[in-house]
């Protein structure tokens, strides 16, 4: 049984999607970000930076934090959506999501939805970056059925 510590955010949804896709039994423990539950000492033991999601695989007492690492773990464990022969390409697209797509679009969301008008520089910068990212993703999907190739993978789930 997998225990998923999560909140209603894109990073949390990724793991729920993966668990559903692989047909894994799991339970969700909600982490209330509005009440700063992610910064409680017992949660920091699971996730040193106080970020969701986290899973505990109660079958082997493994605890994994960071959505990309969790997707890799679940893909490897289940044998689904993380094929050995395509692993390098899958990892490249997964890391692009973790390092560029997610953080940059997240910044755009912060400036445009939570703090509009507070930083013209931030709003313009992240709007341009987000527009470019969507353009690159569209270009990739014109040449490939899925991000990492012809098959649905954890890179698609992450993005």
Spans of features found by a protein language model:
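GST-like domain detector, emphasizing the conserved glutathione-binding G-site
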Residues: 1-125, 131, 138, 145
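A glycine-rich, coil/turn loop motif that links secondary-structure elements
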Residues: 146-153
């Amino acid at each position: 049984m997998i225990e998923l510590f999560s909140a209603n955010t894109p990073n949390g949804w990724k793991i729920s999607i993966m668990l559903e896709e692989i047909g894994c039994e799991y339970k969700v423990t909600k982490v209330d970000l509005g009440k700063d539950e992610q910064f409680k000492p017992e949660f920091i033991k699971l996730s040193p930076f106080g970020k969701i999601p986290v899973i505990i695989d109660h079958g082997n007492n493994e605890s994994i934090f960071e959505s990309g690492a969790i997707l890799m773990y679940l893909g490897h464990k289940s044998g689904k959506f993380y094929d050995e022969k395509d692993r390098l390409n899958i990892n490249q697209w997964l890391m692009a999501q973790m390092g560029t797509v997610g953080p940059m679009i997240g910044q755009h969301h912060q400036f445009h939805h939570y703090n509009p008008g507070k930083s013209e520089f931030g709003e313009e910068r992240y709007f341009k970056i987000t527009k470019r990212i969507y353009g690159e993703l569209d270009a990739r999907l014109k040449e490939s059925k899925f991000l990492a190739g012809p098959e649905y993978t954890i890179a698609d789930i992450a993005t």
